[in-house]
Amino acid sequence: YVNTVNPKEIKGPHLHKNRTTYFYCISGDIVIVIEDNEGVIHEISSNANLPILISVPNKLSAAIINPTNNISKVLVLADVAWKPNDNEMENTDFKDYDWLKWKK
């Protein structure tokens, strides 16, 4: 599916218990913030001019951020199909992460 991310919007963080998710920026600019198994935060930038495929394995928390003043679009792919009421997603929180820096 295509996910639209509004200017300065933060989607997430959350994790998927069973599926690996792939993100590919098709319009605008995005930052994917991922917390690895050791609690280290990684910020991966991508845009439509230099797109990269970003893979987030299951059980890792991630958020999508649009740091710009324009709408961005992200192609989101998964290796396991979504099913209603499967409780496969879990909201999370990066305790010491500075989310406010993206609102400036």
What are the residue ranges of the model-derived segments?
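Non-catalytic, conserved peripheral segments adjacent to functional cores
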Residues: 1-53, 69-104
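Alpha-helix/helix-capping structural signal
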Residues: 59-60
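Asparagine-centered strand-capping/turn motif at beta-strand->loop junctions
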Residues: 64-67
